[in-house]
């Protein structure tokens, strides 16, 4: 009977070591060597080395001198542990009321301007760190006014941070909210704050 169990035990032990230890270590090693920033969460640090965010996860920016991310289905604080879509269909009364309230507030701030869809709709995860270039341009006048800048200065930062579709055809053009806001702080500190 032991002769029948021995191959099974050896196979289980071998595959445990191979797939539970060797393979994960190899993948981690390759990732750390080839893509260290991405392998460690695409973290963004300030001048002192303190982590201030990640380019992969949205965070709340409510002040007028900053671009604002998309609304979050994960709560007001963009809580990653609550990440998910709202599962509300397009005819859901709660969703319609929230989007109308958000659109009315944006319309009051920007009369006569077309509101981009992603300014009032959540992403699938609720934590999308990027907005459309149209949404960034929509917010640029508010940011410029709050920082005492010309609109062209803010637009130049947005254009400099804009990314096209992956490989030229996958996805949509996008702007990372955190990187634009960090660049604005570095180049044009708002109301006496230190850049960086």
UniProtKB/Swiss-Prot annotation:
Report the coiled-coil segments: none
Record has ATP-binding as a keyword: yes
Q: Which InterPro entries match?
A: KdpC (IPR003820)
Where is it located? Cell inner membrane
Give the GO molecular function terms: ATP binding; P-type potassium transmembrane transporter activity
Q: Where are the transmembrane segments?
A: 7-27
Q: How does it sit in the membrane?
A: Single-pass membrane protein
Q: What does this gene product do?
A: Part of the high-affinity ATP-driven potassium transport (or Kdp) system, which catalyzes the hydrolysis of ATP coupled with the electrogenic transport of potassium into the cytoplasm. This subunit acts as a catalytic chaperone that increases the ATP-binding affinity of the ATP-hydrolyzing subunit KdpB by the formation of a transient KdpB/KdpC/ATP ternary complex.
| Similarity comment | Belongs to the KdpC family.
Name of the molecule in the record: Potassium-transporting ATPase KdpC subunit
């Amino acid at each position: 009977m032991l002769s029948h169990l021995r191959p099974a035990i050896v196979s289980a032990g071998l595959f445990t070591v191979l797939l539970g230890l060797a393979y994960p270590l190899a993948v981690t090693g390759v990732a750390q060597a080839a893509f260290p920033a991405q392998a460690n969460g695409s973290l963004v640090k300030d001048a002192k080395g303190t982590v201030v965010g990640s380019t992969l996860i949205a965070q709340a920016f409510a002040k007028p001198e900053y671009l604002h991310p998309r609304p979050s289905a994960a709560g007001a604080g963009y809580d990653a542990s609550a990440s998910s879509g709202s599962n509300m269909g397009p005819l859901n009364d709660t969703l319609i009321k929230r989007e109308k309230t958000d659109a009315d507030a944006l319309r009051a701030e920007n009369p006569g301007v077309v509101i981009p869809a992603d300014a009032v709709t959540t992403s699938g995860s609720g934590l999308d760190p990027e907005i459309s270039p149209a949404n960034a341009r929509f917010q640029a006048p508010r940011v410029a006014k709050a920082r005492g800048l010309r609109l062209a200065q803010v637009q130049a930062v947005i254009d400099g941070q804009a990314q096209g579709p992956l490989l030229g055809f996958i996805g949509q053009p996008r702007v990372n909210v955190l990187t634009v806001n960090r660049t604005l702080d570095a180049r044009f500190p708002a109301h006496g704050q230190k850049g960086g």
